[in-house]
Amino acid sequence: MPRKGPVPPREIPPDPKYGDVLVQKLINKVMKDGKKSVAEWIVYTALEEAAKEVNMHPVELLHKVIEKLKPEWEVRPTRVGGATYQVPIEVPERRQISLAIKWLVQAARERPRGREQYTMIERLKAELLDALNERGGAYKKKEETHRMAHANMVFSHFRW
């Protein structure tokens, strides 16, 4: 195998409407089967409707939501002498953003399809507003991750 070192992170171009990289990352995560125009429509509509409810700019809303969902700690399994320990580690900034977006979209997709929240637009909008108010599936996932890391702090000396 050639040894050319680590691969540099890929540059993601900003989205066409707001010129923001974070919005583009959300669009890419919502996209299914390469249907980017559908994903753009879902994300833009959900952001605009959610922003209208809280009187904010859509990009500002997304940045606040992602900031609230970013995990600072997570656990990684580490094998030491035949036993596997869940060792808490600090999460790098890039991974924090990736996890926050992943949890947001995952929680929106898993929301029950009721009368008020039938389409993905409505579910994503509801999840954005819930995350802004520190509720919802994505926020619970972050809290659960932090709880796991805090509970396993006794193994933090295995970080190397």
Curated annotation (Swiss-Prot):
Protein's GO biological process: ribosomal small subunit assembly; translation
Keyword Protein biosynthesis included in the entry's annotation: no
Keyword vocabulary terms for this entry: Ribonucleoprotein, Ribosomal protein, RNA-binding, rRNA-binding, tRNA-binding
Domain of life: Bacteria
Signal peptide per UniProt: none
Molecular function via GO: mRNA binding; rRNA binding; structural constituent of ribosome; tRNA binding
Pfam family membership, one: Ribosomal_S7
InterPro entries, per database record: Ribosomal_uS7 (IPR000235), Ribosomal_uS7_bac/org-type (IPR005717), Ribosomal_uS7_CS (IPR020606), Ribosomal_uS7_dom (IPR023798), Ribosomal_uS7_dom_sf (IPR036823)
Gene3D superfamilies linked: Ribosomal protein S7 domain
GO cellular component annotations of the record: cytosolic small ribosomal subunit; ribosome
UniProt function note: One of the primary rRNA binding proteins, it binds directly to 16S rRNA where it nucleates assembly of the head domain of the 30S subunit. Is located at the subunit interface close to the decoding center, probably blocks exit of the E-site tRNA.
Stated family: Belongs to the universal ribosomal protein uS7 family.
Subunit structure: Part of the 30S ribosomal subunit. Contacts proteins S9 and S11.
Protein name (record): Small ribosomal subunit protein uS7A
